[in-house]
């Protein structure tokens, strides 16, 4: 949104109030964070309920909005992975499509842009094409819901002669230049988990005599590094496909502005990043030794130390994405963006992003 406003676009935001804060207040706060609060007059905020007829908008206002909108960007979704939240995820990502699709038809929009995920590719696939997914098995309910949503939207847009772009990012992290981010999940979660474990034992050593740490083979070495015996088992060799948010934004804008017909676009990284690389970066930044990435099944009789057990619990939802062997076709994206590529994930980028995350306490102090 910020980039579109900076380029002079007028935007109508469909959304909801949250936590005793109106939609207008939420958007105003975001624009201040982006440093473009002067663009507030380019934004019209409309309280909506995607589950209601006419999106819960009064009839007269609904008709007026239909007369002024020429494109829709749909990015609302429930990103929960947990199977226990299946009903909620399906309601948000599939059932709630009806209202926004009907609005698009009634408004006779030229384009419908859908923000999906590269992981609609599902499991058991090694080469992922920029086409609708036909697989039946997925890592989690989020992937499944987005794959089904793509098909529903595609059928609807074809039936109603609406051009459709489906934009499929992989895992998005903060700005590669500033480190700034509004969310700290995915890539951040393993790092935050390891930092939390480090701090528990560092505090024990510095303030409580270090008995708990010593019992688990944890100590501060002669170079001042914390030795933290953490073996991370991953099922097989593979990569974690990550892109910075600035690449995601710039690529999405180019696709929106340049595409003239239907298309599916993978916003993924051709440069390989492994958990071994991230573990090395983590050790360097956090002054830790002892983190080991092991590819292959965990032995049944392996006795896990408390450090490893705690880390395993923390990262369980994200484990399938940490050693991914899928390759994503980027032909459409390259053509639509003049071969715009994301940067390789260097230590400097990692350091910048993680230092910002720590500065804002992993998101709890962003707006303070």
Task: Identify the residue ranges that each predicted region occupies.
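Active-site Tyr-X1-5-Lys
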Residues: 137-170, 175, 189, 194, ...
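A conserved pocket-lining segment of Rossmann-fold NAD(P)-dependent short-chain dehydrogenase/reductase
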Residues: 178, 187-247, 251-254
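N-terminal Rossmann/SDR dinucleotide-binding element
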Residues: 1-71, 75-78
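Glycine-rich Rossmann NAD(P)(H)-binding loop
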Residues: 172-177, 232-239, 265-273, 283
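A hydrophobic C-terminal alpha-helical subdomain
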Residues: 212-235, 299-341
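Conserved Rossmann-fold NAD(P)-dependent oxidoreductase catalytic core, especially the SDR/UDP-sugar
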Residues: 71-74, 82-87, 91, 95-144, ...
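Mid/C-terminal beta-alpha module of Rossmann-like enzyme folds, strongest
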Residues: 250-317
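Amphipathic terminal alpha-helices
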Residues: 1-4, 9-15, 327-368
């Amino acid at each position: 949104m910020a980039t579109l406003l900076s380029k002079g676009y007028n935007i109508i935001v469909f959304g909801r109030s949250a936590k005793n804060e109106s939609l207008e207040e939420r958007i105003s706060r975001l624009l201040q964070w982006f440093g473009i609060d002067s663009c507030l007059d380019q934004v019209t905020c409309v309280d909506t309920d995607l589950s209601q007829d006419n999106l819960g908008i009064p009839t007269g206002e609904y008709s007026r909005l239909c007369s002024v909108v020429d494109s829709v960007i749909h990015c609302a979704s429930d990103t929960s992975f947990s199977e226990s939240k299946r009903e909620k995820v399906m309601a948000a990502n599939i059932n709630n499509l009806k209202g926004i699709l009907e609005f698009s038809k009634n408004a006779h929009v030229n384009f419908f842009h859908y923000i999906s995920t590269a992981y609609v590719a599902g499991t058991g696939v090694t080469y992922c094409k920029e086409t609708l997914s036909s697989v039946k098995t997925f890592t989690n309910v989020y992937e499944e819901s987005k794959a089904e949503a793509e098909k529903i939207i595609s059928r609807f847009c074809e039936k109603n002669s609406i051009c459709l772009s489906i934009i499929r990012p992989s895992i998005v992290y903060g700005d590669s230049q500033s480190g700034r981010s509004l969310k700290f999940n995915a890539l951040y979660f393993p790092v935050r988990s390891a930092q939390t474990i480090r701090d528990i034992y560092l505090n024990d050593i510095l303030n409580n005599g270090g008995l708990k740490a010593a019992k688990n083979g944890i100590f501060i070495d002669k170079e001042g590094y914390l030795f933290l015996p953490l073996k991370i088992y991953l099922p097989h060799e593979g990569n974690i496909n990550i892109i910075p948010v600035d690449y995601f934004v710039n690529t999405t804008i180019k696709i929106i502005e340049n595409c003239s017909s239907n298309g599916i676009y993978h916003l993924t990284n051709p440069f390989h990043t492994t958990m071994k690389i991230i573990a090395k970066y983590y050790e360097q930044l956090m002054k830790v030794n002892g983190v080991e990435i092991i590819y292959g099944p965990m032995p049944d009789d392996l006795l896990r130390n408390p450090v490893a057990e705690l880390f395993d619990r923390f990262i369980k939802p994200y484990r399938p994405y940490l050693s991914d062997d899928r390759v994503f076709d980027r032909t459409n994206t390259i053509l639509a963006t003049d071969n715009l590529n994301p940067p390789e994930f260097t230590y400097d980028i990692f350091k910048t992003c993680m230092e910002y995350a720590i500065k804002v306490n992993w998101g709890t102090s962003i707006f303070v």
